[in-house]
A protein has these predicted regions:
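C-terminal partner/receptor-binding element of secreted or periplasmic proteins
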Residues: 131-145
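Axial heme c-ligation environment in periplasmic c-type cytochrome domains
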Residues: 61, 68, 90-132
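Periplasmic/extracellular electron-transfer cofactor-ligation site
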Residues: 38-65, 79-80, 88-104, 144-146
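Short, Lys/Arg-enriched N-terminal segments with co-localized hydrophobic residues
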Residues: 1-13
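Electrostatic cytochrome c docking/interface patches
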Residues: 25-41, 71-79
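Sec-dependent N-terminal signal peptides
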Residues: 17-27
Length: 146
């Protein structure tokens, strides 16, 4: 019922706040320059968003929507990088995007890839592997902000 929905929303908010806090700590420690995130970006995002994040990738002209640039996310958010929104957008498994949208649902793709490769074994679940890739990618996006 309503209480269950509220708990789910509260859980999502708490998870996003926790992730955002982890990102702030990682960014402050210099992890934002991690090459793993850059590699992930070049493989998963540059085709549409461009190698420099300006929204001018080789596939951008083939899409029926305008591909946004990613270098001014902080500037367009009052100088603060919108951690939770970026993570949720990349992940795509929460909310309306899970039912289809202009971006791939990377969280599901990453989790399936971890499961298929056998990389998610022991204490690392496919979901944890997916979130790690999303966090690396988010840290890279922080590093390219103007």
């Amino acid at each position: 019922g309503r209480l269950e929905g509220a708990r789910t929303t509260g859980d999502r908010m708490m998870r996003r706040a926790t992730i955002a806090g982890a990102l702030v700590a990682l960014a402050a420690s210099g992890a934002a320059a991690d090459p793993v995130g850059r590699t992930e970006y070049m493989v998963a995002c540059a085709g549409c968003h461009g190698e420099s994040g300006l929204g001018d990738g080789p596939l951008a002209g083939l899409l029926q929507i305008e591909t946004p640039g990613l270098t001014r996310l902080a500037a367009e958010n009052g100088g603060e990088f919108p951690y939770a929104d970026v993570i949720a957008t990349i992940d795509g498994r929460d909310g309306l995007r899970a039912h289809g949208g202009p971006m791939p649902i990377w969280g599901e793709r990453y989790a399936q890839a971890a499961l298929a490769s056998g990389a998610a074994e022991g204490t690392m679940t496919p979901d944890m592997m997916a979130r790690a890739r999303i966090l690396s990618l988010t840290l890279y996006l922080i590093s390219i902000q103007e």
